[in-house]
Amino acid sequence: MNYVFCIIGIIGYRLCLEQLSIYNNLYNWLIKKGYSVILENNIAQALNLNNVISGSTFDIGEKADLAIIIGGDGSMLRIAKILSNYPIKVIGINTGNLGFLTDLNPKSALSTLNYILNGNFYEEKRFLLNVITIKNNIKSKKHILNEVVVHSNNVAKMIEFKVYIDDVFSFFQRADGLIISTPTGSTAYSLSAGGPILMPLLNAIIIIPMFPHGLYSRPLVISAKSKIKIKFSKKILNLSISCDGTSPFKVYRNNEIVIKKSKKFLKLIHSNNYNYFNVLRKKLGWSKKFFKKIK
């Protein structure tokens, strides 16, 4: 048999009984089909199986052809930052809530995976953003798949900032914060803030002021080729940045924040019968009333 993928990694964080049964069933199913399987270390320890190959997420990224992520979108976000460094392809089994990134249903995951492992899939290269903090010419860098959020440390406290696009001043804003989102992140926090939904492969970035103090402030969609720079008012004391929902870190009024497209991509794969608008309709409840009337 000619395998599309030879070595498959299984990754996940939650180790409750329900999750463990999914890990166990998936592992045994792949082994019976003749694949080499690498279990992430914590899964291997929890399953306590004999003669298993285990490793870190980095090991899986380096050695495997495909990683199967079991969890929610949060799990995928955490893992994306590591696996985007490798040519490995990624697919997710959703045991979380919405599951925009982990789109396989646990109940039908094996049958869908069987279809995919026979070559019936396509790849989406989801770009990441670089978030660069500059202070006294010293740079620190983070990578995000969904969004970066700049906000005050104090609840309901506005911040003042200037936004430059390609080093040209674009606008000044007083707001609770600012969201910079990728197309992948357009169905996450950006959506809750009133941002548009973008097709995943659009080469674009969303800029959304959060609760702006101004009647004419609107979300912007710009080319992902552009560089975004944020400068803060000298009046502002307490600022933080959150990257993909992780614990915020402090920034200061004399810091500059530069955000631009990374050279890294998450290589996400889907079944050939996957359709993004079907996902939006199901996840967001579009057209429910319409279909009820027809019935």
Swiss-Prot record:
Cofactor dependency: a divalent metal cation
Assigned GO CC terms: cytoplasm
Sequence positions that bind NAD(+): D73, G74, R78, N146, E147, K157, R174, D176, T187, A188, Y189, S190, L191, S192
Catalytic reaction annotation: NAD(+) + ATP = ADP + NADP(+) + H(+)
Annotated compartments: Cytoplasm
NCBIfam families (alphabetical): PRK03378.1
Family the entry assigns: Belongs to the NAD kinase family.
Name of the protein in question: NAD kinase
Species this protein is from: Wigglesworthia glossinidia brevipalpis
Upper taxonomic lineage: Bacteria, Pseudomonadati, Pseudomonadota, Gammaproteobacteria, Enterobacterales
